[in-house]
Regions:
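Juxtamembrane interfacial secondary-structure elements that flank transmembrane helices
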Residues: 64-65, 86-90, 117-135, 274-278
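Juxtamembrane helix-capping/reentrant segments at transmembrane boundaries
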Residues: 62-78, 92-101, 132-153, 220-227
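Glycine-/proline-rich flexible loop or hinge segments
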Residues: 53-63
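Eukaryotic endomembrane system proteins
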Residues: 130-189, 198
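A basic- and aromatic-enriched beta-loop-alpha substructure that forms the phosphate/nucleotide-
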Residues: 100-142
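Hydrophobic transmembrane alpha-helices
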Residues: 2-50, 55, 74-117, 165-210, ...
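Residue-level signal for the start and early helices of compact helical domains
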Residues: 56-57, 128-131, 148, 202, ...
């Protein structure tokens, strides 16, 4: 999963003067706080992008444009924080700013880019293929005056949530303080993080691909492949990916606040915009439009967990395949590190 990661310096070496405290000589005590150094800049970026997206969504009557923003904005924020800010503050080139990052931070940045780019491409392709707004949003658009309050009720709150979710890949580039672990366990922690990322990325990608292929051939619910593990394997994969971002932080100076990132992402997927919203919409549509599909959904809800697989599902061949993808990711990352980071 690290095939986009270029050469770097050794993990236990200084990341260079560009990311060291001397260059932050003008920072006041208030600047090192997470609110001013990380959360507020992230919220400013996300809220600006959300406003532009809201205007475009209103003009096209497509609420789903906010879903395009979800992964792309996170990638943009990660790269702006890690590379863009040092470039603008110190007048340096892209290559110089990137070379200043230690290996693990390059892995983190690459993982965010790989995950976000694939998800954005998938959402955009699905949107173009469908030719209309996502079914989840058709009902809410019928509410009187929906677009007048949509920015404050939908777009802006998601910008705030994104600001917290992004902590695991913005804090490492904005705050120098943290807890350090021994050099002997750095490689182990990084390998674990890459393995979790590889498994989560593969699970999310497999879920999207299998669902798309299923819909080309049949009209009933997709309950095979990784969809036979849980009812929402794509959201589980996304959760694992964000957990891996926090784990990668532990392979360097670790600020515990980054844990809020995957926690916020999990809570959002479980209780706000993920499986809860999806199934509520499915139940409403299937009950009135497709009784057979509604019956399948009700049966599936009894047989399979929504988010976390049961113990018997852990030995499912597809679960083993996902775990194998995580192992392959570790091998690839280690190969690149041994080749370029020695």
């Amino acid at each position: 999963m690290a095939y986009l990661i270029p050469p770097s310096t050794l993990e236990n070496q200084s990341s260079s003067y560009l990311h060291s405290p001397p260059l932050r000589s003008n920072i006041t005590p208030g600047d090192v706080g997470i609110l001013r150094s990380t959360l507020l800049p992230s919220f400013a970026l996300y809220s600006s992008l959300s406003l532009a997206t809201y205007i475009a969504a209103d003009a096209t009557n497509r609420v789903e444009l906010k879903d395009w923003l979800w992964p792309s904005a996170q990638v943009l924020n990660a790269w702006w924080t890690a590379i863009g800010q040092p470039m603008t503050k110190h007048g340096i080139s892209f290559g110089t700013a990137y070379a200043a990052l230690p290996w693990t931070k390059r892995v983190l940045l690459s993982c965010v880019a790989i995950w976000g780019t694939r998800l954005f491409a998938r959402i955009a392709y699905r949107s173009f293929s469908r030719g209309r707004d996502d079914a989840r949003y058709e009902a809410v658009k019928k509410e009187p005056g929906f677009w007048k309050g949509a920015f404050l009720r939908i777009f802006l709150p998601e910008a705030a949530v994104l600001s917290v979710i992004s902590l695991s890949f913005t804090v490492p580039f904005t705050m120098d303080t943290g807890l350090s672990i021994g050099d002997e366990v750095v490689d182990v922690v990084r390998a674990l993080a890459v393995g979790v990322f590889g498994a989560g990325f593969a699970l999310e990608a497999m879920a999207d691909m299998q669902l798309a292929l299923h819909r080309q051939e049949r009209t009933d619910l997709c309950r095979h492949g990784v969809w036979g593990l849980v009812r929402h394997p794509n959201y589980l994969g996304d959760t694992l990916v964000h957990v891996s971002f926090a784990l990668l932080n532990m392979a360097g100076p670790f600020n515990p606040v980054v844990i809020l990132g995957p926690v916020a992402n999990y809570l959002f997927l479980r209780f706000l915009g993920g499986d809860k919203e999806t199934e509520a919409n499915q139940e409403e549509r299937y009950k009135s439009q497709d009784p057979h599909k509604y019956g399948q959904l009700r049966q599936w809800q009894v047989e399979k967990n929504s988010f976390w697989p049961g113990l018997r599902d852990l030995v499912n061949p597809w679960a083993l395949a996902v775990a194998g993808c995580g192992f392959i990711g570790v091998v690839i990352e280690e190969g690149f590190r041994c080749t370029y980071d020695m």
